[in-house]
Regions:
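Non-heme iron-sulfur electron-transfer modules
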Residues: 1-9
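Conserved mixed alpha/beta catalytic, RNA-binding, or beta-rich assembly cores of soluble enzyme
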Residues: 12, 18-27, 35-319
C-alpha cells in the first residue's frame, strides 16, 4: 500500500545503468518529475550492413555536456523483423552491444530472443516483445535471463490484460510499449496509461512506457523530432527514433533538461572558489552568481581564455 503508484525500473549496468519510471505526479508543477525520458536509436535486421555500420558510426558523434549533464543517445533499439533468422539477429545485437550503450531487443520470437540474450544479458537489456499470444514463453525467457520484459497489445484493453497475466506469473519487472497504429492512438495510449497509474492508482498500468516513433513516423525525421519533444513532455519513458543528429539533439535535450529539472530547487552550483587554468592564491579573481547556466557559460569562456584565475561563486540562491 505504501509503494509508489508507478514502479521504478532499472536497465543497463555500470555507468550505463538507467532508471525509468517512479513518477508520482501527472504535471511537473505539482511536485517534480523524477526520472527523465531516455532516447533510443533504432537498428533493424531489415537494414543492409552498410546502413547498420553507418548508423553505428553516427550514434557516438552526438555526445556533449550541457549545464553539467551528459547529452547522448543512451539506448540502442535492435529490431528483429519477421524475416530475420536467429543468426542474423544475434550478429546485429553483437554489433550494437559493442557500442557500450544499453540495449532494447525488439523481438517477439522466444527462440530468437533467447539466442540474442545469450550474448548480451549481462548488460541488462530490455526484451521488448511480449504480447497476448506469446507472453508466457517471452516471460520465461526474460525471467531466466534476469532482464526487463516489454509488453505490448493491439489496444489498451489487450495491453492491460496481458500485463495482468504476466504479473500473475510473478513478473513485475516490466515496461509497457504504448505505441499504437498512428500518432493519435499512440498519444492517447501513453497518456491514458499514465493517468490510470497515477490518478486512478491502477498498478497494472504502473510501469514505464516505450514509444516507438520509428513505427508511427518512419522515414520522416522532422516529424520524429517533433513527436520526441511531445512524448518527452507527455510520459514517454523511452522514446525510440530512427536517428539522433545534433540537429535533433540540441533542442530535444535542452527541452528534456528543463522539463526534468526540479521546479522546487533552482539549478545552482555550490558556492566557493574554483581555481581554473592553474590558478593559485596570487591569480586574478573573477566572481559570478551560483545560477547553474550562468556558471557554465562563464566558466567555459574563462577556461578557453587560458588565463590562470580563481572563479568565486557567490551564494545568490540559484538566481
Amino acid at each position: 500500500a505504501t509503494a509508489p503508484p508507478m514502479k521504478t525500473i532499472k536497465i543497463g549496468t555500470g555507468d550505463e545503468e538507467l532508471t525509468l519510471g517512479g513518477e508520482t505526479v501527472l504535471f511537473r508543477h505539482e511536485k517534480t518529475f523524477v526520472n527523465k525520458t531516455r532516447y533510443a536509436v533504432e537498428l533493424c535486421t531489415c537494414m543492409d550492413d552498410a546502413t547498420v555500420d553507418a548508423k553505428l558510426a553516427e550514434i557516438p558523434k552526438v555526445d556533449y555536456d550541457r549545464i553539467g549533464e551528459r547529452m547522448y543517445a543512451e539506448i540502442v533499439y535492435v529490431n528483429c523483423d519477421a524475416e530475420a533468422t536467429a543468426d542474423k539477429y544475434v550478429a546485429l545485437v553483437q554489433k550494437a552491444a559493442a557500442l557500450g550503450r544499453t540495449l532494447i531487443l525488439g523481438c517477439s520470437d522466444p527462440e530468437i530472443a533467447k539466442a540474442a540474450l545469450e550474448v548480451c544479458k549481462d548488460s541488462k537489456p530490455v526484451l521488448n516483445g511480449a504480447n497476448a499470444s506469446n507472453y508466457e514463453a517471452m516471460n520465461a525467457v526474460a525471467t531466466a535471463a534476469g532482464v526487463v520484459l516489454g509488453v505490448s497489445g493491439k489496444d489498451l484493453n489487450e495491453l492491460y490484460d496481458t500485463t495482468a497475466a504476466i504479473e500473475k506469473l510473478g513478473n513485475k519487472n516490466l515496461v509497457l510499449d504504448t505505441t499504437g497504429a498512428d500518432v493519435k492512438e499512440t498519444f492517447a495510449n501513453t497518456v491514458q496509461v499514465r493517468r490510470a497509474a497515477l490518478k486512478d492508482q491502477d498498478r497494472t498500468f504502473g510501469y514505464p512506457s516505450i514509444v516507438n516513433l520509428a513505427k508511427i513516423a518512419g522515414g520522416d525525421y522532422h516529424l520524429q523530432a517533433g513527436l520526441a519533444a511531445m512524448f518527452t513532455m507527455k510520459y514517454g519513458s523511452i522514446v525510440v527514433m530512427e536517428r539522433m543528429t545534433y540537429a535533433e539533439a540540441l533542442p530535444l535535450y535542452g527541452l528534456r533538461q528543463n522539463v526534468f529539472t526540479d521546479p522546487q530547487k533552482p539549478m545552482r552550483v555550490e558556492p566557493g572558489i574554483y581555481p581554473m587554468n592553474g590558478g593559485d592564491e596570487n591569480s586574478l579573481v573573477v566572481t559570478t552568481v551560483d545560477f547553474a547556466l550562468t556558471y557554465f557559460l562563464v566558466s567555459g569562456e574563462l577556461e578557453r581564455s587560458g588565463v590562470p584565475l580563481n572563479l568565486v561563486i557567490n551564494d545568490a540562491g540559484g538566481l
